[in-house]
Amino acid sequence: MNSLDANTRNTKSKGDVRSLRSAGNIPGIIYGGPDQNQKVTVLKKTLKSLIDKGSFLSNIITLNLDGKPQNVLPREITYNVISDEPTHIDFLRVVPGVKIRIEVPVVFINHETSPGLKRGGVLNIVRRKIELKCPSEKIPSAITIDLDGVDIGESFKISSVKLEEGVTPTIIGRDFVIATLAAPTVMKEPEKPAEAEAEAAEDGKEAAPAAEGDKKDDGEKKATEEKK
């Protein structure tokens, strides 16, 4: 489990928050559970390194607030529209037994042992993330789809995914598709329109008499030369 150090934040104005960011820190807040919301600050450099690892918003982390560890789930990150740098972060307290909604990434493995992919098949991914409802202590890091032995024409539906007890997709009532393995697309040369074929045939008919006329002219020219 990843960890992140945080400190209690006592900012009271926008100027205080700007000064905080200028010093390389990111303001945030912890909410949820029986405790009150708490303002915090984290080091931007450390936060960005965790974000770059991927699936940051889908994994519980240990937040060491003023040296005291607590489990939280990163819920939302606000970014600067120009620099794309993080400017604020929300953390949700993890309370055992309490169910939450969370998007979990879909990961595909064993591409190299799929006969369908070896024959040029195309993996069409319909959903790269799936929203689940689950207890905070049972959040899966990812939904894994095994492509081993999968051939062209096969598909993966949510019913084929084994989830822990108490973990369910938020979409209910239908067995939605996650991905399919389709046949390779072959580009065919467009057929010549019937009108174009008819015009080509007419051009051929017109060219034939002209050729015969040229042949006749050549014969007459040769006979004249012999008389001379």
From Swiss-Prot:
Annotated NCBIfam families: bL25_bact_ctc (TIGR00731), PRK05618.1-2 (NF004128)
Source taxon at top rank: Bacteria
GO cellular component, one term: cytosolic large ribosomal subunit
Nucleotide-binding as UniProt keyword: no
SUPFAM superfamilies, per database record: Ribosomal protein L25-like
Lineage, highest ranks first: Bacteria, Pseudomonadati, Pseudomonadota, Alphaproteobacteria, Candidatus Pelagibacterales
Pfam families referenced in this protein's UniProt entry, alphabetically: Ribosomal_L25p (PF01386), Ribosomal_TL5_C (PF14693)
Protein name, as recorded: Large ribosomal subunit protein bL25
One Gene Ontology MF term: structural constituent of ribosome
Keywords on record: Ribonucleoprotein, Ribosomal protein, RNA-binding, rRNA-binding
Regions of compositional bias (Basic and acidic residues) in chain numbering: 202-228
Residue span of region Disordered: 1-20, 187-228
Ranges of biased composition (kind: Polar residues): 1-10
The species this protein was found in: Pelagibacter ubique (strain HTCC1062)
